[in-house]
Regions:
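FIC/Doc superfamily catalytic core
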Residues: 1-307, 311, 317
Length: 317
């Protein structure tokens, strides 16, 4: 099994682009604290919108969808799931609510990750929610001729529990030492999580839940008000490209996570920009206008992602 050393990120040269990204996000974080104090009631209403968008977008990336009406009823818990897709959606809803409401009390450990995964799949009859994979999985794609091929082979099932323990320990150690910016440690951890691919199902969705959780715990709460999942869904080709670039040489510890770090940081910046723009116009009446405009677009995710490629489905689900 490969070694992990997150504390060593302190000595890595990230380049001006990454440094500029970090500075900008730090600046936005300062504004975030001011906004939360000034307009708490209005911002709470933005939370409702972001939860719906996040649940729809994160599932849409995996080819999981339902109608706009059914989505809203599921989010409000006014109906029960009718099929596999709706059960998946209900599970993400529940897991996201847990993250939103309890992030301060959810440390990064394999046990808590397993619990979150169990919640994610709690409405399905898969039978492996809350358990690491017990058979080898592969990150695959399908070429234009319809031939399937392997892009990346994650660690074997017997290596997975130890790998998950190590990356959690490394993350917590690096965060505790305070020498490396959490905004660098988080994407590197998520990248390693996706390379390990610890579950038979739900790896992509779990990676997005963990991204949100770790950002919240680090004080970056923009995902509460602006859906990070929706940003990823909008640019999922760039997401997959960054992940593939960063996976090269991973088993041999020759990988370079910079592409994925840049991608995630740019996504956070895009969310903060939207947050900054929206907060300038937010008021009890104007927020209703914003909410209605966003809700009118929710159903369009179904149109945007009606034909996910097998490549996309295999890589994240």
């Amino acid at each position: 099994m490969r070694r992990f050393d997150y504390a060593g990120l302190e000595n890595r040269k990230w380049g001006n682009e990454v440094v500029n990204y970090l500075s900008l996000i730090h600046e936005y974080k300062g504004k975030q604290s001011t906004y939360i104090k000034q307009k708490p009631r209005e911002l709470e209403r933005l939370v409702e919108i972001a939860k719906v968008q996040s649940t729809e977008a994160s599932n849409s990336i995996e080819g999981i969808r339902t109608t706009e009406t059914r989505l809203r009823r599921l989010m409000n818990e006014r109906t029960t799931p009718r099929n596999r897709d709706e059960r998946e959606i209900a599970g993400y809803r529940d897991a996201l609510n847990i993250v939103h409401e309890n992030f301060d009390y959810i440390p990064l450990t394999p046990n808590y990750i397993l619990q979150l995964h169990k919640i994610l799949l709690s409405h399905t009859d898969s039978g492996f929610g809350g358990s690491f994979k017990n058979v080898q999985n592969y990150i695959s794609a399908t070429d234009e001729a319809g031939k399937r091929f392997t892009l990346f082979t994650p660690p074997a099932p017997y290596e997975t529990p130890e790998a998950m323990q190590v990356i959690c320990d490394e993350y917590n150690r690096a965060i505790g030492e305070g020498k490396v910016d959490p905004l660098l440690i988080i994407p590197v951890f998520i990248h390693d999580f996706l390379c390990i691919h610890p579950f038979l199902d739900g790896n992509g969705r779990m990676s997005r839940l963990l991204t949100t959780l770790l950002l919240y715990r680090a004080g970056y709460e923009v995902g509460k008000y602006i859906s990070l999942e929706a940003k990823i869904a909008k640019n999922k080709d760039a997401y997959y490209a960054a992940l593939e670039d960063s996976q090269v040489g991973w088993h041999e510890q020759q990988d370079d996570p910079t592409a994925f770090v840049k991608y995630l940081l740019s996504t956070i910046i895009a969310a903060y920009r939207d947050f900054d723009d929206r907060i300038q116009i937010v008021s009890p009446t104007s927020l209703d206008t914003v909410k209605n405009a966003i809700e009118n677009k929710l159903g369009k995710f179904c149109l945007l992602y009606t034909s996910p490629s097998p490549r996309d489905t295999e890589r994240s689900r």
